[in-house]
Amino acid sequence: MIKLSLLLSLASFTAVLANQRPRCQRCPVSSSKYFQQNNLLESRFQNEVQRLCARRVREESSSESSSSSSSEDCSRRRRRPHREWEDSCSSSYSSCSSTDSCSSSAPCPPPVAQRCDIELKTPIILMGERIYEFLKNYEDQYKKAVLLFLTNILSQISGFNPVFPGGDYDALIEQLKTLGVTVPANTAAELAAIDAAESSALTRAIQANAQKVISDLLTRVSAMCYLDIMSLVNSGLLASQVSSVFNNIQPIITIAGNDLFAKQMAVFQKLSKTLISTAVTNALQGNRAKFTRFYTTQTSNLQTSVQNSSKTLTSELKKLATDTETAFTAFANAEISTPVRRIFRRSITSSGFEDAEEGEDKDNTGEGEEGEDKDNTGEGEEGEDKDNTGEGEEGEDKDNTGEGEEGEDKDNTGEGEEGEDKDNTGEGEEGEDKDNTGEGEEGEDKDNTGEGEEGEDKDNTGEGEEGEDKDNTGEGEEGEDKDNTGEGEEGEDKDNTGEGEEGEDKDNTGEGEEGEDKDNTGEGEEGEDKDNTGEGEEGEDKDNTGEGEEGEDKDNTGEGEEGEDKDNTGEGEEGEEGEDKDNTGEGEEGEDKDNTGEGEEGEDKDNTGEGEEGEEGEDKDNTGEGEEGEDKDNTGEGEEGEDKDNTGEGEEGEDKDNTGDAEEGEEGEDKDSTGEGEEGEDKDNTGEGEEGEEGEDKDNTGEGEEGEEGEDKDNTGEGEEGEEGEDKDNTGEGEEGEDKDNTGEGEEGEDKDNTGEGDEGEDKDNTGEGEEGEEGEDKDNTGEGEEGEDKDNTGEGEEGEEGEDKDNTGEGEEGEEGEDKDNTGEGEEGEEGEDKDNTGEGEEGEDKDNTGEGEEGEDKDNTGEGEEGEDKDNTGEGEEGEEGEDKDNTGEGEEGEDKDNTGEGEEGEDKDNTGEGEEGEDKDNTGEGEEGEDKDNTGEGEEGEDKDNTGEGEEGEEGEDKDNTGDAEEGEEGEDKDNTGDAEEGEEGEDKDNTEEGEETT
């Protein structure tokens, strides 16, 4: 506006100077009058016009010219310019035309006045008229909106006519009749009529009060100017005065309710002064309260509606003012540009308009180099080109120009190189190309341009290199390509472009290199490739692309390097920190949960086969590797986590599959075919369930050591101390409970099956042994029982043997709490678990196989050496500190128990055929099962209830285990209806499946 005022003043003063020419037509009466009436020029310019005009008239009267043209022609030409615009100046030279004498022999002089009018005065006047009309239309629109709002409020008030439903007076009259009171027949109708009358009166009172307030306000606003109305709205006074309608309504409602009660009470008082009973008083007071609540609710609803309308008006007026201000700025700049180009023509180069055009070009000039070109000029190089110019190089091109190189091209120009191209230009190189241009190189290409290199290409352009390509362009290199472009290199390619290199490619482009490729592009290198592109290198490849290198590959791409490869890509190389849940094949640092083959630091849950370094997640698929995480699929490796699948390795976690190795810190339970379950409950075919087993051994493990309070209902063979339930399956042992299956042992309970042992209970089977306190009978052919009865062919049963030595070991040293039922040959001091598979190593546990080494324990195989223990196998060595039992053919069993054919089982228990199982228990065929517990072939299920085929449901499982998991640890209050074999503490329901257990309440 400052520029507008300056130019108007300069142009008007130039017109004044031009009128000093000695022609009477020069008097600028029209412009002076127009700007004076419309208050567009300051008074000093008007005074200057008057002064110059009067001086010029005096000069012309003293020097009349002689012309050769006819007086008629000259006079006609002099009268042409705007005769209707006259002021006081015209009277002083009204005789100008009559005093001129034109010679017929010579032509009239050139119409200087007309030429000057066309050149400056007339365009300025017309420009002022257009600007005035623009602003006047806005003011009228603003005022009409406020008046319409008040009119609508009046309409709502006029339509406020609620009808009170009235009370149930028939019931009151019947009650009075039962009391012996004679009531006239029309009493109920009379009471209802009072309700209707009071309701109508209150409605009219509310309407009259509100209509008066709003009508007065409408009258005052109608007489206001725009600025006064705007101040009224912006200050909140308008909304406050409208809301005042409801300020005194509540007292009116209360008064009306009291009148209603008094009039209805008078009806009964007319019948009898003493008739007013408690029933009548209560009924009429209840009707009054109902009346008051009804009208309070109705007026509250009306007030809410009016307040919402007031808020809507305020919001719409603010939007109108903002939009109109923007439009007027562009309009005024366009108007000013016309006389600027015509008058100055870029002649001022040192300090004029040409050099100073560093700001924004928002009009229709055609040039807006360094500034922001928001109009229809055509050029807006360094600034922001937001109009339909065609060029907006360095700035932001948001219009339909076609060029918006360095800025943001948001229009349909086609070029928006450095800026953001958000329009349909086609080019938005460095900026953001959000339109249909086709190019949006450095910026964000969000339109249908096709190019959005450095920015974000969110449109259908095809190129969005450095930015984010979110449209259907095809290219979104550095940005995010979220459209159907095909390229979204550095950004995020979320569309169907095919390329989304550095960004996130979430569309069907095919390339999403550095970003996230979530579409069907095929490439999503650095980002996240979540689509069907095939490449998602650094990001997360969640689609069917095939590549998702550094990001998370969650689709069928094949690559998901640093992120999570959740699709069927097949590759997820270095730094994959996400989770690979698809069939890619690689999911390095992240979690590989698909069929990729690699899931290094994350969780490899698919069928990939590989999960190299730093896999901290869980490998639940068929990848083959799941190092630090939990490998729960068929991968083959699951180092520090829990390997619950068929991988082959389960280092630090729980080895619950057929891996062969479960080293240190195995805290979970072995519920599958692994061979060991250290601190937890061994409910599967493992063979061991060391210390703290509070639940029951319901599977084919063979052991259930300390604190087994449940019953051994499966084919385990052992159920040591504290077994309070009954052993109804083929386990072989049922200590304190009743051993009714074919286990072979039933210490304190009743051994009614073919176990071989029944200590404190009755031994009715062919076990052969019934040690201390056997209150039952010995009915088999064992032959020996030191402190108990030794009924097998071992040859030895030393001190403290609380269990039964039923295999061919030959030794059962001190504190053997479990039962050595296989051909290992060793069961040293404190042997709490049992190694019943063919692992080869069982350090702290029991070495019952043909390994060859059993350090501190008993060497019962053909090894040749047994230092502190007895070496009875063919290993040749059994050094010191062997606390477990080596029952397989491995040859070594340091600290843990190696119960499969692996050859190594350092700190944990390796119960499958993998060869390695470091810290956790690997219960599936993965090879790794580190820290958690896997009860199926999935690979994991820690704290909740595992009701599906997942494999896990550890602590706090309050529901029932209804699937084939095998585990339902603490607090299982429901019933075990599946083939799990376990229902530990607090199982209050019944065992209706094939588990054979129902602990505390069965």
Curated annotation (Swiss-Prot):
Sites carrying sugar chains: N308
GO biological process terms, semicolon-separated: sporulation resulting in formation of a cellular spore
UniProt-annotated stretches for the region 50 X 12 AA tandem repeats of E-E-G-E-D-K-D-N-T-G-E-G: 357-998
Residues of the signal peptide: 1-18
Primary localization: other
Protein origin, superkingdom: Eukaryota
Region (Disordered): 349-1002
Function: Spore wall component.
Note: SWP2 is a major antigen recognized during host infection.
Subunit comment: Component of a complex composed of at least SWP1 and SWP2.
Residue ranges, compositional bias (Acidic residues): 354-1002
Protein name (database record): Spore wall protein 2
First and last residues of every Sequence repeat: 357-368, 369-380, 381-392, 393-404, 405-416, 417-428, 429-440, 441-452, 453-464, 465-476, 477-488, 489-500, 501-512, 513-524, 525-536, 537-548, 549-560, 561-572, 576-587, 588-599, 600-611, 615-626, 627-638, 639-650, 651-662, 663-674, 678-689, 693-704, 708-719, 723-734, 735-746, 747-758, 759-770, 774-785, 786-797, 801-812, 816-827, 831-842, 843-854, 855-866, 867-878, 882-893, 894-905, 906-915, 918-929, 930-941, 942-953, 957-969, 972-983, 987-998
Compartment(s) of residence: Spore, Perispore
Organism of this sequence: Encephalitozoon intestinalis
Keywords in alphabetical order: Glycoprotein, Repeat, Signal, Sporulation
